[in-house]
């Protein structure tokens, strides 16, 4: 929530509001006790899912996303294997004091200018979840300097000067967290035709050289050789 009365280097213009409840909807509505502003689900830019939520299962989350017709279903899904969502949202970037905007822009910029990261929209998460044999990889972010995060005990003020950065991509298999390297993520993105712009560094005599891929199209053909089946 933007607070116009806060200004200066020591005060964040962002107030982080949290809520609790037995259900997702109850938790969301409970935040109205802490602010006069009205929250609209259609305004969501991204949903941050803690690692504990992803390892325990997505059944309740998916039920809420599919049933609620007020959601735009165009927002991003993000996670972190190192930090809690409240700490991520309470961190101020040197580039943008609005931590929500900074995190969204960092994901999109990494996807379109680097290639080692790709965004995950909620529609893709829903489709992958209900398709057998298909795992979902999530953008993984972290707080670069954790010693400066959450300087106060109150969740209501965002005062940390830590910088949130995009780390890598992860997926969850049988409650196990598997992190992909930049090269592994780029390989997956090439196979899935999700490369929009990527840099590839190749070793050569006397050093390395980097090439930029502006467009890529991959076609997979599977073949079953019955003669090799025992």
Where in the sequence are the language-model features?
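Membrane-proximal alpha-helical signals and transmembrane carboxylates
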Residues: 1-230
């Amino acid at each position: 929530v933007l607070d116009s009365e806060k200004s200066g280097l020591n005060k964040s213009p962002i107030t982080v509001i949290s809520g609790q409840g037995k259900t997702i909807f109850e938790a969301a509505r409970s935040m109205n006790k802490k602010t006069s502003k009205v929250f609209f689900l259609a305004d969501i830019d991204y949903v941050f899912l803690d690692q504990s939520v992803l390892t325990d299962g997505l059944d309740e989350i998916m039920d809420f996303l599919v049933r609620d017709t007020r959601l735009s279903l165009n927002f991003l899904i993000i996670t972190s294997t190192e930090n809690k969502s409240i700490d991520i949202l309470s961190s101020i970037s040197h580039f943008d004091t609005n931590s929500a905007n900074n995190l969204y822009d960092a994901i999109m910029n990494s996807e379109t200018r680097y290639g080692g990261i790709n965004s995950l929209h909620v529609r893709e998460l829903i489709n992958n979840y209900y398709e057998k044999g298909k795992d979902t990889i999530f953008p993984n972010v972290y707080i670069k300097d954790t010693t400066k995060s959450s300087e106060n005990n109150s969740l209501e003020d965002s005062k940390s000067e830590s910088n949130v950065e995009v780390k890598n991509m992860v997926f969850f298999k049988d409650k196990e967290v598997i992190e992909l390297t930049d090269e592994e993520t780029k390989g997956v993105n090439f196979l899935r035709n999700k490369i929009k712009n990527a840099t590839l560094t190749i070793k050569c005599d006397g050093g390395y050289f980097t090439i930029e891929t502006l467009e890529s199209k991959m076609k997979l053909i599977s073949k079953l050789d019955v003669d090799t089946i025992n």
